[in-house]
Structures are given as C-alpha cells and as structure tokens.
Amino acid sequence: MDIDEESYLNAGPSAPSKIPQGGEGDRLQGMSKKAMKRAAKQARLEEIKPLKRAAERERRRQRTAQLAEGYAAGTLSEADKELVERRRRVEKERKEAQRRIESGDQANDWLGGVVIDLGFDDLMTDQEIASMAQQLGYLYSSNRTAEKPVRTVIHTTFSPAASPRLWQRMENFNWHKWSRCHWWEQGLETLKSQLDPSTSILSVQSVVSKETQDKAGIDTKSLLSRLTGPQVPVDLQAGKHKLVYLSADAEDELLSLSEDEIYIIGGIVDRNRHKNLCQGKAEQLGIRTARLPIGTFLEMLPTRKVLTVNQVFDILVKYLHLGDWAAAFEAVIPIRKYAPGRKTKRAKTETKRNEKEEEEVECTSAEGEEDIGVIEESAEVDPEDVFSNQ
C-alpha cells in the first residue's frame, strides 16, 4: 500500500478534513490563516496514520519473510545475518523471562523499586509526549529481558485527567499488559504519604477521580480499572522503603543501589529547557535527591549531555547485574562511539543511525512480533506492533 503523504497533507479545501464544531471549532475560527492551515494539516496527518501503520506492517511482514527465506538459504549479507541472529537471541531471552514470570520463578528480581514520575504532561510538546511514550516502551522491554529485573515499576500521574496527551499516546502500547508495572492516577506526593508509616493506610482501595471517570468512554473505563493507585505494591513497605529522586542537579552522589530504596526518574523530555525541575520538585516534597556517579562519563560525550528516561533505567538495571557503574554506563552508551577521532559530522550521523537501528531491533525483538526479522533504519516504529504482548 503506497501513500502519497505529501500530496495528501498539502491538499486544498477539497480535502476531507473539516474544522470541528463546538468549542474546538470556535477556537480554530479565532486563529490566523496560517495557524488554521497548520491545524488542518495536522488533522489530515491524523487521518492517514492508520493507513501508514497498515502499510508499514505489511512492509515489515514482507521484509520478515524475505529474511527468513534468505537466512534458510544462506544468502543474506553479513549485516542482515547478524541482525537476524541477534533478534533470535533476544527473542529467546524474552521467552525465558516470560516463562519465569508465568511459573512464579522471580527469585532473581531486585526487590527495590523504580518510579517514573509522569507529572510533567503540560510541560512537553506533542512531539516530546510521543518520545516519552516510546521511552516507556523501551524501559519496559529492557526490564522484561534484564538479567536482574526490577520487581516493581510504578508510573505516577497517569490518567486521562492527570496526563491527557500521554494517556492518549499510550493507548496504542497496551500498557495494561506490561508485567512488573503499576500505574497510578495519583502523583508522587500520594506515594510519599503512603510510604510514611505515620500517614499511610494499611488497606486502601484503588481510587480513580470523578473527573477522570466523567471523561472516560467505554473503552477508557476498562483501562481505568487497571490503575492501581494509591495501593502500594505488596513488595514495597511503609516505613522500610525510602524515596530517592534521581537528579543531575543533586549534590549527593549515588554510590550503590539499595533494596530498601525506591528510585524516582523524572518522566520528561524537555531537551534541558527546564533547569532544576526534578530537583526543585523533590525539594518541595521533602524527598532526598541523588545523582548517578557518571559525571566523568558524560563529559566524554560530545553529542549527548541529557540521558533519556530509558537510558537512566538501563544504567540502573545494568548496575544491578554488573555491580560496577563504569561497566553499566559503557553497556548502555559505549564510549568508543564517541572517540575523538570520530567527531566528524559523518561519524556522528553514522553513530546516531546505528544506535537507532540497534534500539529498534532490540525493542521489537523483545516483544516477539515475528520469529525472524529486523526493523530497517527508515521504518517508523509502530507502538501497536512493537509493544503488543504482555
């Protein structure tokens, strides 16, 4: 299925998209011509998304069949052969991890906790919201195949009312099937009070706000039943587990990870626009802050100064497995890719391309869309396909 996207997006008044009626329509009517044109183009883009995704899925199926046939016949290039074998290895690890969960064999799980603070929906652009959703998918995939996975990952401030744009994005990711993950409409302040033995309630029912229920449609109401806050997961105990907000602006350095602590990662993509955001929030809530001991490594990266949410999480789980911060950081972002001799524009472009391909292949493979296959560099990662299981 081929889609002439450019022609469709630039279509004139005859295009099927219409300015909506009611409140949204009134808002658009007050816009300038340029703003209205931009809004109409965005509406047309939303219309063709299902078509693009269907076309991409078909292209992937064809590519997967070609790879399977070529692998069996021994006619693949070395690069394609390596990618196929890597994907098989990751798929094998995924199945083994799933087997352990289903059999109740979680003895190797790390019994501390990680919180993703999603209380920044209003500070991100739509593009950043999309990136945040993708990062949450990568994070889940990493944890599910980790040598020592985190038993409890809580996502706070997540609902149609608390984080409307992220909620909408995440509908395509089947988040409610993710193992070891807990989702709260309530914010970080509620979690803090629940872990405080002087204020926490031993038995509390999951509560979804009336505002959220009023906004919910039929499908959304079924998803709302998967929100578990403010019930603290059974492996975390009030009075025992302490919160630690990870912030690059913190004075204290995190020397090791403790199963008596819950580490908070700020769920925001802001390209470093908002200075001291997480540090300030933690101080306001009275939560201890600490920074990862990787400052010397960050200084060696000429093109990367801000770590993504999934990269921070990956460093944590790699440290849990390796017991060494330097080895953990090197495993997540290899320093060799940023050697002084490779600081040319071409080298940087190649590095970014390779990292993107590696991430997409690993992420897709971990979810087992097919037995053999790769996501090519030009392919758009479809969350509906990539994160469809568990």
From Swiss-Prot:
Active-site residues (renumbered): 270
Cell compartments where the protein resides: Cytoplasm; Nucleus
GO CC annotations, alphabetized: cytoplasm; nucleus
Protein name, as recorded: tRNA (guanine(9)-N1)-methyltransferase
Basic and acidic residues composition-biased segments: 43-59, 347-356
Gene: TRM10
One term of GO molecular function: tRNA binding
Keywords: Cytoplasm, Methyltransferase, Nucleus, S-adenosyl-L-methionine, Transferase, tRNA processing
EC numbers on record: 2.1.1.221
